[in-house]
Amino acid sequence: MNPIVKQFKYGQHTVTLETGAIARQATAAVMASMDDTTVFVTVVAKKDVKEGQDFFPLTVNYQERTYAAGKIPGGFFKREGRPSEGETLIARLIDRPIRPLFPEGFFNEIQVVATVVSVNPQISPDLVAMIGASAALTLSGVPFNGPIGAVRVGFIDNQFVLNPTMAEQKQSRLDLVVAGTDKAVLMVESEADILTEEQMLAAVVFGHQQQQVVIEAIKEFAKEAGKPRWDWVAPQPNTDLINKVKAIAEARLGDAYRITEKQLRYEQIDAIKADVIAQITAEDEEINEGKIVDIFTALESQIVRGRIIAGEPRIDGRTVDTVRALDICTGVLPRTHGSAIFTRGETQALAVATLGTERDAQIIDELTGERQDHFLFHYNFPPYSVGETGMIGSPKRREIGHGRLAKRGVAAVMPSLAEFPYVVRVVSEITESNGSSSMASVCGASLALMDAGVPIKAAVAGIAMGLVKEEEKFVVLSDILGDEDHLGDMDFKVAGTREGVTALQMDIKIEGITPEIMQIALNQAKSARMHILGVMEQAIPAPRADISDYAPRIYTMKIDPKKIKDVIGKGGATIRSLTEETGTSIDIDDDGTVKIAAVDSNAAKNVMGRIEEIVAEVEAGAIYKGKVTRLADFGAFVAIVGNKEGLVHISQIAEERVEKVSDYLQVGQEVNVKVVEIDRQGRIRLTMKDLAPKQETEINQEDSVEEQE
């Protein structure tokens, strides 16, 4: 085995590509490394196409092995299970830029598997996996019009940073991943701390320029290690069949695409399609229905795109920059903490915000260690939202991806945990869908958060842009419909506030998208976003002044960190009894900060007073009311402040001589005692003699709570 190795500098990092030593039975295999983060990527492509195959079966799997970080998986089985949300998102990140680079009509099955086998905590594996996948596909010989490059762009101290480390990313106001060929950008995925449109575009251009070093290196690598290019020829169009479909359907489809209501339009199109299939197969039963459907779909595309390029109204009658009618309702669910329904045309999202305590935070076990997520965002896309039946179960890749995009859009305006000590979960239920449901989720989430009283920094809105490009002519579309997304050349989603962009996602199906086109799209998106924000601000101009009556209220108090063990108690007994008896939730930080969550304010005051008692210092000479906890021959043990026990010796129970302790005291009896002494070991000596009732020092719970508040 003589491996072929290609090494090159990529910003501050060194990238190594190696092939020829491992997985030699795969169509292609590349070990890609960047400063000790290593991802092994394989490509297997089938030479034969399944009979009747009418789509491109590309599968991308991304998997992280815990041994990469020197760890053993948890759980009973001690092995990796189903893909995590993070793994699913990275698989999509790899898939999105490579899928458009396979030629139309190529239906051979291809599987890309990226396995993380070593990880440097400072280098994220996602970029390495994308570079490895690009290299493996380029080596494989399949008709792949790559290679692609991939880059991460940060923004620190008003400067773009190429492939920042994990430490640098924490300081960055931008996390932007760009992938593209030597000529054009194909994909953008980003999250930003309210940057301007100009800054976002500059970051995309910067990233595309910097990734050229990757593309050139892979080309050189392929010259040395690449397999012969497949002798694949695109199937010739069946002119006779195309003309037959046109003759039957073209005029009728033109009329159907003037129906503005989605369901009625779809019913009409389905009827035309069924008629076309019936007429043509009646003449020739051997004709493949799939080919008829492909030609029918291409005809739909020609009609819709041709009208848009010609400047005619869009499918629903709008101009290119018009946003569909908006309808907003807040506070729609009576017992939830915050809710809103956001409707844009035939797309509708029911967004619900829920407030929880720190113990509700999601613990995410990553290769580099555990972290807690205090802002959760879940997106659900049930089949009824598009008038269909279907399976309902765990979220699919698309739902996970859309939820993450919507979360990115809102994350920049969320308050810190110090400003708002709640874990926040937003769920977006898509109840209707006809394009841009993820951006409807951003708008709905912003409204629901404000309805819940979450002090977000500003309202956030999202908009999806589209593109139709024919040679030198192009038209940018605002607020695209589902059909315009399907038949167009670009899906360009922008979320942001009035001040700037918080998230940008772009998927491009063609080459030739210039910075000029992206600038027009960003400017048009900004105009649409301002319009939507104006309507949202009329519905709810600012976050509610107070949280819901049904949400837990968090009360904070400070105690001496040395007293934490007293509040927790042996085996957690004390804190458990406090929470069970008062119906509250208690979290204690290492610095002595105690957070009490309770729906009932009286319960919170009660537990705060009891904690004050527990941590209060016992003073020598002070008189307390206590409770007898146990009896002994030599005296009685009495619990005073915070259940601290002291001993009343038999000689200190009464003025007269006491023969038997039980003649004077019983377990559970309340008595007044005076602290005689606290020795070096913390033992408390008590007396019941010489007490002056008027001078009792008793802890008053209500007073102590009021002092804390």
Curated annotation (Swiss-Prot):
Pfam families assigned: KH_1, PNPase, RNase_PH, RNase_PH_C, S1
An annotated GO cellular component: cytosol
Natural source organism: Haemophilus influenzae (strain PittGG)
KW Magnesium (keyword) present: yes
Residue sites binding Mg(2+) per the record: D485, D491
SUPFAM superfamilies (alphabetical): Eukaryotic type KH-domain (KH-domain type I), Nucleic acid-binding proteins, Ribonuclease PH domain 2-like, Ribosomal protein S5 domain 2-like
Homology family: Belongs to the polyribonucleotide nucleotidyltransferase family.
Residues in S1 motif domain copies: 621-689
Subunit description: Component of the RNA degradosome, which is a multiprotein complex involved in RNA processing and mRNA degradation.
Cross-referenced NCBIfam families: polynuc_phos, PRK11824.1
Protein name, entry field: Polyribonucleotide nucleotidyltransferase
Localization: Cytoplasm
EC number assigned by the record: 2.7.7.8
Listed CDD domains: KH-I_PNPase, RNase_PH_PNPase_1, RNase_PH_PNPase_2, S1_PNPase
Reactions this protein catalyses: RNA(n+1) + phosphate = RNA(n) + a ribonucleoside 5'-diphosphate
Cofactor(s) listed in the protein's UniProt record: Mg(2+)
Top-level enzyme category: transferase
Alphabetical list of InterPro entries matching this protein: ExoRNase_PH_dom1, ExoRNase_PH_dom2, ExoRNase_PH_dom2_sf, KH_dom, KH_dom_type_1, KH_dom_type_1_sf, NA-bd_OB-fold, PNPase
